[in-house]
């Protein structure tokens, strides 16, 4: 990778020795003549914010389909929450906040409409054609699919951002396979490791909020979860006259704080115990250092188990999943059978990428709303085309 001149003096001078630094980046795929001197990771963050795929996250959902209500989280609000949590952790660990923020904002760019159901459906439909995995799709978005700059496709992000995207993992993800450009088998930067946990902290706690708002879960049910009960009771003791709604919101806020404090304390202990003083040390030791303590990890496991059984498998969520699968399957099969239904620029890509992959890219880029409207246009006789 090569890179034009980017700002070096503007980078924080108080970063920990094991932090990633823009000045030490492995560079970009394409050399550019930059018009200003922003540090590399700051530029990456800005490019992600201004790309089309990031804007579309506003109408891609987490658990609830977009038209179910305006209150519920979308992929955009989730990404912003991950960025806030990730930066808070990065600041406490003394690592690069700009790289952390860039990774947070990019981590869901490859997500399909209709949450994880969309990913599961596309992966089944793409069996025999390379499959589908949202981390790899996020990489495709920033490396190939965005069309903004003269001379190249993609966003031409720094090597460290791309590495963090392809090595992102959460309980929903599967291994993304070997990508030779990004040190396969080697742990990513601490900033990338932070995002794995910030992602989980954000969706666990904010799915509680959305689940309570929807009525799919109740406070009585949550009181059976040890960690929630401890914090919920603590808020009541601290604020005896607090109303139930504010108590709920303050409990969620305090839970996030509990996770951040435990994660940073445990991670710093790991860094010190392993005597990691540089990014090279981290790569050489090749062990993740960002982690919860065993006690908090167990409490978090129970919280996730509660959400899985009571929210993600709620019968109304299951109904949304079944409908979403029908929409995406019929769209995919129709586009593959009749490629002229796609915009011309996608038809032109089929000779190079193959019909199925182009259709997959097109559907993966849809918002919930666009997918629903497209389904109506194709399959409802009185809908305008």
UniProtKB/Swiss-Prot annotation:
It comes from the Bacteria. Residues 1-14 have a biased composition (Basic and acidic residues). GO terms for biological process: dGTP catabolic process. The keyword Hydrolase applies. It holds the Pfam family HD_assoc. InterPro entries: dGTPase, dGTPase-like, dNTPase_2, HD/PDEase_dom, HD_domain, PHydrolase_assoc_dom. The keyword Hydrolase applies. GO terms for molecular function: dGTPase activity. Disulfide bonds: none annotated. Residues 1-23 are annotated as: Disordered. Residues 75-204 form the HD domain. Keywords: Hydrolase. Transmembrane segments: none annotated. Signal peptide: none annotated. Belongs to the dGTPase family. Type 2 subfamily. This is Deoxyguanosinetriphosphate triphosphohydrolase-like protein. It comes from Geobacter metallireducens (strain ATCC 53774 / DSM 7210 / GS-15).
């Amino acid at each position: 990778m090569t890179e034009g001149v980017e700002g070096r003096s503007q980078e924080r001078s108080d970063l920990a020795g094991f932090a990633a630094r823009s000045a030490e980046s492995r560079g970009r795929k394409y050399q550019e003549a930059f018009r200003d001197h922003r540090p590399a990771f700051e530029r990456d963050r800005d490019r992600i914010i201004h790309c089309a795929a990031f804007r579309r996250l506003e109408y891609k959902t987490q658990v609830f389909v977009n038209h179910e209500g305006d209150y519920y989280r979308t992929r955009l609000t989730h990404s912003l929450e991950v960025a806030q949590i990730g930066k808070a952790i990065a600041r406490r660990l003394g690592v690069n906040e700009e790289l952390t923020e860039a990774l947070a904002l990019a981590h869901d760019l490859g997500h399909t409409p209709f949450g994880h159901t969309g990913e599961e459906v596309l992966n089944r439909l793409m069996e025999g054609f390379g499959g589908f995995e949202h981390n790899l799709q996020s990489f495709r978005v920033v490396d190939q699919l965005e069309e903004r700059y003269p001379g190249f496709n993609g966003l031409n992000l720094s090597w460290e951002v791309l590495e963090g995207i392809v090595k992102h993992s959460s309980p929903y993800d599967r291994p993304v396979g070997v990508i030779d450009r990004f040190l396969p088998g080697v742990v990513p930067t601490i900033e990338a490791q932070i995002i794995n946990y910030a992602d989980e902290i954000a969706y666990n706690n904010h799915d509680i909020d959305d689940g309570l708002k929807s009525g799919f879960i109740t406070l009585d049910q949550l009181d059976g979860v040890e960690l929630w009960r401890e914090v919920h009771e603590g808020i009541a003791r601290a604020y005896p006259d607090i109303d139930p709604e504010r108590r709920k919101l303050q409990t969620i806020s305090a839970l996030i704080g509990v996770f951040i404090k435990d994660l940073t304390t445990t991670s710093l202990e790991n860094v010190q115990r392993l005597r990691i003083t540089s990014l090279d040390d981290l790569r050489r030791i090749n062990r993740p250092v960002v982690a919860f303590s065993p006690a908090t990890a167990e409490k978090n496991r129970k919280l996730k188990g509660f959400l899985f059984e009571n929210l993600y498998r709620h019968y109304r969520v299951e109904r949304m999943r079944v409908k979403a699968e029908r929409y995406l399957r019929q769209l995919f099969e129709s586009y593959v059978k009749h490629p002229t239904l796609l915009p011309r620029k996608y038809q032109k890509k089929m000779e190079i990428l193959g019909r199925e992959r182009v259709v997959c890219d097109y559907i993966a880029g849809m918002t919930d709303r666009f997918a629903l409207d497209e389904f109506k246009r194709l399959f409802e006789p009185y809908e305008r085309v």
